[in-house]
Design a protein with these regions (language model features):
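C-terminal terminal-subdomain/extension
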Residues: 12-15, 78, 82-185
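Compact nucleic-acid interaction/catalytic patches
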Residues: 42-46, 55-99
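Residue-level detector of flexible, active-site-proximal loop/helix-junction positions
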Residues: 28, 71, 120
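Positively charged N-terminal leader segments that act as targeting/secretion signals
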Residues: 1-14
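Residues at the C-termini of beta-strands that transition into short coil/loop
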Residues: 25, 68, 117
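Sequence-level motif detector for i,i+2 pairs with an aromatic at +2
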Residues: 17-19, 59, 105
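Short N-terminal edge-element motif at the start of the domain
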Residues: 13-46
Length: 185
């Protein structure tokens, strides 16, 4: 059995739950910027990310989508999000964002997604001491549809998006491979 280590309040070896919200460690943001990518380095480790998809090919790799409270956005930003959302479905910009209405309106920044491993999760995002997990099927289907389009573009044009998804993914894959070798020794 794999030994568990505490990273924040998230145990290494503990599995992330698909569709759960988590708070990331600053380390993943530092990796993104060190590889030439751009991310919300100033507050990205304070906001929840949506870990929507377990990678189908790489064990231990997940995909994180940053979220934001839309009420903190100015009118021009909200106009931009609405313009993207109003684009024809064939236009990739229609996949950049998704808005989820709940207790508060959350913006899912799908085009800012990045790969992540449990090592870079600080803790579960909780409300009233309960881990927040997105359960509304319509939102999950739409987020996943848009996410697949973003990743398809990234696969055609590596590092197309500002966070350098391909470079971050390759870095994390090498890290997972190195850790797997250590575990077998």
């Amino acid at each position: 059995m794999k030994e568990s280590f505490c990273y924040g309040s998230f145990l290494l070896g503990e599995q992330m739950i698909e569709n759960g919200l988590y708070v990331v460690k600053r380390d993943i943001l530092n990796i993104i910027t060190s590889l030439g990518g751009d991310c919300d380095i100033n507050s990205g480790d304070k906001r929840p990310v949506f870990c929507c998809v377990k990678d189908k090919k790489v064990e231990g790799l997940y995909w994180a989508i940053p979220t934001s409270d839309i009420s903190h956005r100015d009118e021009s930003q909200v106009d931009y999000y609405n313009m993207c959302l109003a684009c024809d479905e064939r236009d990739l910009r229609s996949c950049y964002y998704h808005i989820v209405k709940g207790n508060r309106t959350a913006l899912y920044k799908i085009s800012s997604c990045y790969p992540i491993t449990e090592k870079y999760i600080d803790h579960e995002y909780k409300v009233n001491n309960i881990h927040v997990i997105v359960q509304r099927n319509e939102d999950l289907l739409e987020i996943n549809r848009k996410f697949r389009r973003i990743i398809a573009m990234e696969n055609r044009k590596p590092n197309y998006f500002r966070q350098h998804i391909t470079d971050v993914k390759n870095y994390l894959i090498k890290e997972l491979e190195t850790e797997a070798i250590k575990d077998t020794n």
